[in-house]
């Protein structure tokens, strides 16, 4: 069992189906057994699954996360066009949306930020001070790429705005 099909496929398994709302699946020595805990359960979605949490190669409810993110970038351009020189993704999860934005707008995509791969998620730090420090340690601009350029920064989401505020300074 896995929350994303990609985890199963990486291990050479085959995705069979999703567990239904209110369903309990038990696998034991006698096989797989499915029980409905509640028959009136309604499926609920967390939008952050497609926007942020899921891997790009994951498919959730028949929607590929990469394609969802890329399409959101195209929609961003249509809804909020701007006159800039470069589209710069916030690594790593901002890339698919930035690609879509660049494709739809015709504005070149450029890697303008380098991510420190050893820094974890910044929005879950307990204090604002810790979040600010973590963002400064996590992302560094490529000055020779962004200097004197008008850029649009594309990130996957804004939870507290800490990353955005620090990057635009």
Protein language model regions, located:
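PRPP-associated nucleotide enzymes
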Residues: 1-169
């Amino acid at each position: 069992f896995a929350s994303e099909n990609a985890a199963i496929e990486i291990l050479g398994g085959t995705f069979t189906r999703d567990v239904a709302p209110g369903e309990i699946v038990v696998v034991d020595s006698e096989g797989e057994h499915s029980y409905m805990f509640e028959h009136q359960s309604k499926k609920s979605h967390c939008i952050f699954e497609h926007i942020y949490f899921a891997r790009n190669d994951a498919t959730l409810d028949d929607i590929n996360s990469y394609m969802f993110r890329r399409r959101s970038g195209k929609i961003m351009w249509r809804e909020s066009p701007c006159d800039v020189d470069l589209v710069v993704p916030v690594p790593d999860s901002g890339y698919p949306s930035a690609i879509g934005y660049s494709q739809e707008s015709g504005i070149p995509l450029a890697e303008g930020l380098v991510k420190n791969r050893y820094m974890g998620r910044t929005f879950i730090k307990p204090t604002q001070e810790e979040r600010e420090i973590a963002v400064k340690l996590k992302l560094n601009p490529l000055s020779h790429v962004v200097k004197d350029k008008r850029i649009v920064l594309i990130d996957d989401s804004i939870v507290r705005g800490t990353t955005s505020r620090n990057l635009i300074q």
